[in-house]
Design a protein with these regions (language model features):
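Non-catalytic cell-wall polysaccharide-engagement segments
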Residues: 1-40, 100-175
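Short, mixed-charge amphipathic alpha-helical segments
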Residues: 51-55, 111-114
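Short, solvent-exposed loop/turn and secondary-structure capping segments
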Residues: 74-79
C-alpha cells in the first residue's frame, strides 16, 4: 500500500485486511454515501479526487471505531434498557440490525459481528442507509439525530463528532 493509501490503523498488520474491506465497501456504496452531503460535514470534500474521498470515508469509519471499540473486534457492550441489545465489534453493531438495514446474514452463534470484515461491511451499509434517508452525514439538533448520528452516539453533538470529523479531514489534508 502506498503512503497515500495507508489508513490510520494500518500500523498493525492485521488491520490491513480490514482496510482493504473497508475501502472496497465504501467504493461500492460511495454514490449513497455522497448523498449525505459530505461537503457540508467537511468543507473541501467535493474538491478531493475520488480516491481521497474514499479515504475520507474510511478514516471517518476508523475514527468512529476508535471511540466505539478502541479497534477491538471482540468488544461487546450490553446496552441498558430500553435497548437491551448487545453492541458488538469494531463499530458496535447489533444482530437486531440485520432486518432493519437489510444486512447480510448475521449469525450470533458464529459471532458474525466479531469478524472485522463483516462488521465493517455492515457498518458501511448502515451509514449509507442513514445518510440517504437524511441527506446528511451526521447532525444533532435538540435531541433529534440524523444521518450516522441516529445510530452512533459518538457522532452526536457533545460526544466525539468534532474529533471524528477532524481526524477524517486531517487524513486527507483538509483544513
Amino acid at each position: 500500500m502506498s503512503d497515500d493509501a495507508m489508513l490510520t490503523w494500518d500500523s498493525a498488520p492485521e488491520r490491513r485486511g480490514w482496510s482493504r474491506q473497508l475501502l472496497e465497501s465504501i467504493a461500492s456504496a460511495r454514490q449513497e454515501l455522497d448523498r449525505g452531503n459530505p461537503e457540508q460535514f467537511a468543507p473541501g470534500y467535493s474538491g478531493l479526487p475520488a480516491p481521497r474521498q474514499i479515504k475520507f470515508w474510511a478514516e471517518l469509519f476508523i475514527a468512529i471505531a476508535r471511540f466505539e471499540s478502541n479497534w477491538r473486534p471482540h468488544e461487546i457492550f450490553h446496552e441498558p434498557p430500553p435497548l437491551g441489545v448487545d453492541s458488538v465489534g469494531l463499530l458496535q453493531l447489533s444482530y437486531e440490525d440485520e432486518p432493519v438495514y437489510r444486512l447480510e446474514h448475521l449469525d450470533r452463534n458464529v459471532k458474525s459481528l466479531e469478524d472485522p470484515l463483516v462488521n465493517l461491511r455492515c457498518g458501511v451499509k448502515i451509514m449509507s442507509t442513514l445518510v440517504v434517508k437524511d441527506s446528511v452525514v451526521a447532525s444533532s439538533d435538540g435531541g433529534r439525530h440524523r444521518g450516522g448520528a441516529r445510530y452512533w452516539s459518538v457522532l452526536r453533538a457533545g460526544h466525539h463528532v468534532d474529533e471524528i470529523r477532524n481526524a477524517a479531514k486531517a487524513a486527507v489534508a483538509l483544513p
